[in-house]
Amino acid sequence: ALLFCLVLLVACVSGDSNVEQLAPGVVYHKIHLLEGPWWIHVIEVDLPEAWAAGVRLRTAMGHSERGGVQKTSSLAAGALAGINGDYLYTSKTSHTAGLQIAAGSLIRTPQRQSAFAISGAGKPLIAVYQMELGVLTAGGEDLRAQGFNREPSSKELVVYNHYAQVWHDSVHAARGFLLQGLHGESTINDTVITRVQQVRRRAWPLFLEPGQWLLAAGAEYDASSSIAPGDTVRLYCRLPPAHDKMVEAVGGGPRILRDGAISIEVEKERLSRTFADERHPRTAIGYSQNGQVLFLIAVDGRQPGHSVGMSLQELAEFMRMRLADFSFAKENAYQGLNLDGGGSTTMVVGDQVVNSPSDPTGERPVANAL
């Protein structure tokens, strides 16, 4: 009788899980913890093994004529698995609230909140990123841009890439310098050699192909003596503190694990403490101390008797102390980031939604996905 009680106690505290191998180095865990109760869905990725097998992490953006949203299941169609990403910002158009990089191209600039990024070699990094964007002219002058994919003020220089036309159909600026890439594609922590094809003035339709950029200068920004048609200029985009060439990134916030310690950084990232302390469905991403094991996590919530959701403290505790109970690599998360949650929380495996989204209408359209 004593042995039976001990075994039952372990089952109640530890919970149980179902496991499915999706690809070399990629495993899906469906975890049930009774003390919540919680249903937790985890994609565990052994990055070296998965990378060697050709598996890659990609971001996808919701599309429409003016920015837009799509369901995670649509964004992740054809992928091994996917989770929803960043918060949605809505004004005249809808778009991701923070940083997004896709296939080495910048889509949205970093904000005050943390973001997750990964290099071409599969090295992950969670940080609050800064942006340094501009061109180096043929004469050696560094023309630093003040903005990205938006209209410049009178004293500004702004860079547009081909993603700008998702939100804009025209450009209004004193001058615009059309750049054609000659060598290289990614501009994240790298430079691309380009040639100035033409100069435009005042207002014109915006149409850029991948590999083309536009420098738009305000009326009081004098770049005419530095750039001329036919010049070769180097376009750069740096995202400190990252040093590697980052190929994919998605925003979120707040950071909840820093160097193995629980660190719920809501005040630092100017987010709501109430949002952190209440139980909600949660989406998160984290990785191990050696940077070789990645975790994509969705916690169901707002469903009494099924799964009640987690506070950010509870989410961080699970990632820091309990993931290893289920992980094939026996690893916990050492760094962790909260992503958009609530009704947005969705995990897709093999084109099927595997969690239980909390909205009465089912899966919610989102700004982007991993």
Question: What kind of region is each of these model predictions?
Answer:
Residues A1-V10:
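Bacterial N-terminal signal peptides
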Residues C12-L370:
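Gly/Ser/Thr/Pro-rich low-complexity, intrinsically disordered segments
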